[in-house]
Design a protein with these regions (language model features):
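Radical SAM enzyme [4Fe-4S]-AdoMet core and its adjacent flexible, acidic
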Residues: 140-143, 148-263, 267, 311
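Canonical Radical SAM [4Fe-4S] cluster-binding loop centered on the CxxxCxxC motif
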Residues: 19-59, 72
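Residue-level signature of catalytic and energy-coupling elements of molecular machines
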Residues: 31, 194, 285
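Radical SAM/AdoMet-radical enzyme domain recognition
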Residues: 56-79, 83-197
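Secreted/processed peptides and extracellular or luminal domains of membrane proteins
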Residues: 41, 45-48, 213, 219, ...
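Flexible mid-to-C-terminal extensions adjoining Fe-S/redox cofactors in radical SAM and related proteins
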Residues: 268-372
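Glycine-centered loop/turn positions within well-structured domains
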Residues: 37, 139-140, 271, 297
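N-terminal [4Fe-4S]-dependent radical SAM core
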Residues: 2-30, 38-40, 250-261, 265, ...
Length: 372
């Protein structure tokens, strides 16, 4: 075995930077691409395909990916879906990831429908935090959004996680109908931070048009007065008593009378690409350097055969390096200056090449196919 190989897989982990100088230390892993809800902005066809298990990452494969990632200095891992609690071994997966040297935090994003029955096991497995996707606390509106009358299950899940001592945050995808004040009061009652997320201009989100700062801060200002912006660079102050797992894109605000933080995640109106620190693995085992791009890369080609785990680690490390180096400087969600080339076969032997604007490509994508 070569010296270079030994160094790559058994040497001390180092900090991995992309070609724009950003340190990449955070990985989101979509462990399954099916979901037990059918949210209109995620699955606009209004069918039940979200419930079908198409791709699932095995525990063994996830552990291989995490081990390789830690060798590149990636230390924070978030498990997503689809709905990750549909994965039959999700509790075991969390437990095994936590045992890998170099892992600083493991978190999970869920719709919380199944959280009540998993909360205790996840706590015992060592989960560091859970983000709950919840867009309304009105039962009829919840059913309208998700096509399922399951709000009570979500609330039970949130309560169970909090009772187990798990740090919970609430994520809200902003729409024109979002009741900002009601959701913030609910989060405050539960003692959980809340983050309002700008909908990506993908699929149904292409025509959403809600400006997060105006909608959220404007609504809360009328009730709680002028907010105080929290310096997101001062992580030690913000996360006093917490781990450093939420070193993400949220801008946080505090309000008089609220003992929680209110966060905004604005992919378009508060573009944060220059500080992006993450990379994504899809449920079919591919690497996605950026959500704003339809480009994905092979993690481990199916044709690869390995003599041992060390060799497999080396291949995954090299794939991760390539994906990080390919990470674009910024997303192009609404950029008509960026084009993709689409090649299709015609009825004859000839092929047809079409130039598509990035904004057109994103408008045609389904959010459910991107991953959580």
């Amino acid at each position: 075995m070569s010296v270079r190989f030994l160094t790559a897989v058994s040497g001390r982990a180092f900090n991995m930077h992309d070609r724009f100088g950003r340190e990449i230390d955070y990985m989101r892993i979509s462990v399954i691409d099916s979901c037990n809800l059918n949210c209109y902005y995620c699955n606009p066809q209004d069918n039940n395909k979200n419930c079908q298990v198409i791709n699932t990452l095995s525990v063994k494969k996830v552990l291989c990916i995490v081990r390789a990632a830690t060798r590149l200095g990636i230390t924070h891992f978030r498990l997503t879906g689809g709905e990750p609690l549909l994965h039959p071994q999700i509790d075991e997966m969390v437990s095994q990831i936590k045992k890998i040297p170099g892992v600083r935090s493991v978190s999970l994003t869920t719709n919380a429908v199944l959280l009540a029955q998993h909360a205790k096991q996840l706590k015992e497995a060592g989960i560091d935090s859970i983000n709950v996707s919840l867009d309304t606390i009105d039962a009829s509106e919840y059913e309208h959004i998700t096509k399922k009358p399951l709000l009570h299950k979500v609330e039970q899940g949130i309560d169970a996680a909090i009772e187990c001592g798990i740090r919970v945050k609430i994520n809200v995808v902003l729409t024109p109908q979002t009741d900002v004040v009601a959701l913030t009061r609910y989060a405050s009652k539960k003692g959980t931070d809340i983050r309002f997320i700008e909908m990506m201009p993908v699929g149904e989100g292409h025509t959403n048009g809600v400006k997060p700062y105006e909608k959220v801060i404007g609504a809360l200002l009328e009730v709680y007065g002028t907010p105080c912006h929290i310096d997101t660079e001062n992580r030690e102050e913000i996360n006093s008593g917490y781990n450093n797992a939420d070193n993400g894109p949220a801008e946080y605000y505090s309000f008089h009378g609220l003992d929680i933080r209110v966060g905004l995640i604005q992919a378009i109106h508060g573009k944060f690409c220059d500080t992006c620190n993450r990379i994504r693995v899809t449920a079919d085992g591919r690497l996605m350097p950026c959500l704003g791009s339809s480009v994905t890369m092979d993690l481990v080609p199916d044709s690869c055969e390995f003599t041992d785990d060390l060799e497999k680690d080396f291949v995954i490390v090299q794939a991760l390096k390539a994906a990080i180096k390919a990470k674009p400087g910024c997303h192009n969600f609404n950029d008509n200056a960026v084009t993709y080339t689409k090649t299709t076969e015609t009825k004859t032997v000839e092929t047809k090449t079409t130039e598509l604007k990035a904004a057109e490509v994103n408008a045609a994508r389904n959010m459910s196919r991107i991953g959580g």
